[in-house]
Amino acid sequence: MTETQSALLLRRQLAELNKNPVEGFSAGLIDDTDLYQWEVLIIGPPDTLYEGGVFKAHLTFPKDYPLRPPKMKFVTEIWHPNVDKSGDVCISILHEPGEDKYGYEKPEERWLPIHTVETIMISVISMLADPNGDSPANVDAAKEWREDRHGEFKRKVARCVRKSQETAFD
């Protein structure tokens, strides 16, 4: 049986990330028999509230990748305006190609088949450093980030960072 183009592309990207790791995250398969289910560990970026955290997330790739984007879900609890309460990540690069019916995103900000796991992860790390409060997935976190960044928001993030350190390698 021949490998599909998407499986071949994912295998190449995984091999490249293993050969040339990128600072700030590591990636691997959840199960060695399924190229479409990845687990990533993201290190909280320096000089951010997330610094010191080790956040686990899953990437689920569609069978027609790279024509459509993967879904990303944090497994580790995280308090962030662009991550909903169930852990789903909401950033432009992971949104289906085409027009944004809500008018928040330009077509070029959305998913393009040239994106890779590396570009996705760099975008997620950037999101941790600089949340987008204009298009929140977690309205409560966005409100706290805008109104009480150094108070309640910071306390909730610090709790998530501590918890992530305790459970990082479970």
Predicted segment positions?
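UBC/E2-like fold recognition across ubiquitin and ubiquitin-like conjugation systems
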Residues: M1-D170
